[in-house]
């Protein structure tokens, strides 16, 4: 069931980001993408709060029933409130393939059910693997890599909070453990509201400074315009927050100190993720959903591995060295920003 839930939810991020890229111009896309990813980023942070309350009051099975109710409400909302936006569905079916009749008139040839079935099967089983070819593009691969590293840290921190604060010297109850995720959630909210506007402002500023204008006098944007201080500052902040969290929890310092720094982690991490995702829609113009789907593939694969390894690593080397290592990896990986600033304007090919 978790496998099916993961597959279904991953499509929302890819299709949703592609829709945002189609509806919003480049100059406002960062703002729109920030609001869109407020949901995916807040989900893993808000759910422990709700889950902690349900578990404390009704037991762990209540979390599963809560997920069923929530899923049903979302499904009903999609059926009755979400309009169809596909031009093919709105305007009618595609015209059938035509052939010449004996009298010279063109007659439509209906497509057989078998033919439609194999075409649909090919789209489901073959086309997704062809997308992996886009990863041969260095700009696309580097963007997906850095977004995946930051998202894996996001999962590791969430698991570490639960493990660390449920044991001595803290020993918090389930409901309190859930509330500990609030600062990180607040950081993600601030990043989604402010970060997109910041990124759009930086892009407009860089295009104007470079003197790139079209015939109408409007700035001409490039993906590399987004890689400025709006990327460098959070690239320093969120690894620093990981480092502080690791050492303060290792020393058993009062819970307020390590939990407050999770706000800065959520802020910096979400800024990086939103900027990277927005940039992906511009590196692969016209195929934004493909780019975001590749990003989902990389980040979820890495996050899965990180989730499996977190508990053994915490037991073996402790929070201090695990988060020190993560901070070093993230700081070293931030060199991707420098590379993308210089080499991200060439569109890749599959």
UniProtKB/Swiss-Prot annotation:
Subcellular location per UniProt equals: Cell membrane
Listed under GO cellular component are: plasma membrane
Q: Which SUPFAM superfamilies match?
A: MFS general substrate transporter
Gene Ontology MF terms in the entry: polyamine transmembrane transporter activity
Record membrane topology: Multi-pass membrane protein
Q: Give a GO biological-process term.
A: intracellular polyamine homeostasis
Q: Which Pfam families match?
A: MFS_1
* Keywords from the named record: Cell membrane, Membrane, Transmembrane, Transmembrane helix, Virulence
Question: Any stretches that span the bilayer, and where are they?
Answer: 3-23, 34-54, 65-85, 141-161, 174-194, 227-247, 253-273, 312-332
Q: Which Gene3D superfamilies does this one have?
A: MFS general substrate transporter like domains
Family, similarity comment? Belongs to the major facilitator superfamily.
Q: What is this protein called?
A: MFS transporter OpS2
Give the organism the record lists. Answer: Beauveria bassiana (strain ARSEF 2860) (White muscardine disease fungus)
